[in-house]
């Protein structure tokens, strides 16, 4: 069913986009370790 495929793609993007965004922030935060310690 095409609807299921579209729903799967929408869900994947909905999960991957925020995850990638948080991952970038995490990497930048770890890179600047002097910010916390």
UniProtKB/Swiss-Prot annotation:
Pfam families: PsbM. It is a single-pass membrane protein. Keywords: Chloroplast, Membrane, Photosynthesis, Photosystem II, Plastid, Reaction center, Thylakoid, Transmembrane, Transmembrane helix. GO terms for biological process: photosynthesis, light reaction. It is found in: Plastid, Chloroplast thylakoid membrane. PSII is composed of 1 copy each of membrane proteins PsbA, PsbB, PsbC, PsbD, PsbE, PsbF, PsbH, PsbI, PsbJ, PsbK, PsbL, PsbM, PsbT, PsbX, PsbY, PsbZ, Psb30/Ycf12, at least 3 peripheral proteins of the oxygen-evolving complex and a large number of cofactors. It forms dimeric complexes. This is Photosystem II reaction center protein M. The lineage of its organism: Eukaryota, Viridiplantae, Streptophyta, Embryophyta, Tracheophyta. The gene is psbM.
